[in-house]
């Protein structure tokens, strides 16, 4: 049985690949870049002997192709024990008036393609009587914003979807988990002047592995974002909208 890790070529996805393989688990690692995947596979198999690593070069902009290729790798999904989606994509110019084709790409990568893949996998998990699905949102989705508007909206939609996914499970052996992420030490945040400290992808990957068998829970990382989320919920929305209008981000 294998764990599917989508977006495994860098950042959190890469760290998850190393953590899960380091614990002796077989993994299927996926991203758009076949060369990056091959390099990671070679390094992991050198570090951790007798661990199976398969690569799945695929693009979430083509979810049907992704699913068909995954069926081949995962023997019709019957060989997949869990699916982890540390993926996300955005455009620097993302705002309400972003071009339609870019909006479509943002929604696919951050939301709709993920739900299509999970829908297919869920059938296999129900047949097997067990499974694991882990999704990752963003603190960007806590509140509407002038910039990264569609990215934030898609991450909020994904959070709602995972709540529905958890509510739909009648088998407690199918675990659904969702992490809401603040800033991490990745290439996406490199060089940015951020007001809050960045979290470690490696520490997060270790936390994900440690908590993979718990029942549904939304986990904020770094943890202090949970307090910020609580405060945003109790502040009147009209006041928050005024702040957003007057802000530069």
Task: Give the location of each predicted region.
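Conserved glycine-rich cofactor-binding loop
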Residues: 9-10
């Amino acid at each position: 049985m294998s764990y599917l890790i989508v977006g495994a070529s860098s950042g959190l996805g890469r760290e998850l690949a190393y953590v899960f393989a380091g614990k002796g688990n077989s993994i299927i690692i996926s991203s758009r870049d076949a060369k990056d995947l091959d390099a990671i596979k070679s390094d992991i198999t050198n570090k951790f002997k007798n661990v199976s690593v398969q690569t799945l070069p695929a693009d979430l902009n083509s979810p049907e192709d992704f699913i068909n290729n995954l069926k081949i790798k995962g023997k019709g999904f019957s060989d997949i024990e869990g699916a982890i989606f540390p993926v996300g994509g955005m455009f620097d110019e993302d705002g309400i008036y972003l071009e339609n084709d870019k909006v479509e790409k943002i929604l696919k990568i951050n939301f709709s393609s993920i739900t299509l893949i999970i829908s297919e996998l869920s059938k296999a998990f129900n047949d097997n009587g067990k499974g694991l699905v882990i999704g990752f949102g963003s603190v960007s989705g806590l509140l509407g914003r002038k910039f990264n508007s569609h990215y934030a909206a898609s991450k909020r939609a994904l959070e709602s979807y995972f709540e529905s996914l958890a509510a739909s499970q009648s088998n407690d052996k199918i675990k659904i988990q969702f992490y809401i992420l603040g800033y991490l030490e990745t290439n996406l945040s490199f060089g940015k002047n951020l007001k809050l400290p960045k979290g470690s992808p490696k520490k997060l990957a270790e936390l994900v592995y440690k908590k993979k068998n718990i029942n549904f829970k939304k986990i904020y990382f770094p943890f202090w974002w949970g307090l910020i989320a609580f405060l945003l919920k109790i502040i009147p929305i009209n006041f928050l909208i005024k702040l957003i209008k007057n802000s530069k981000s």
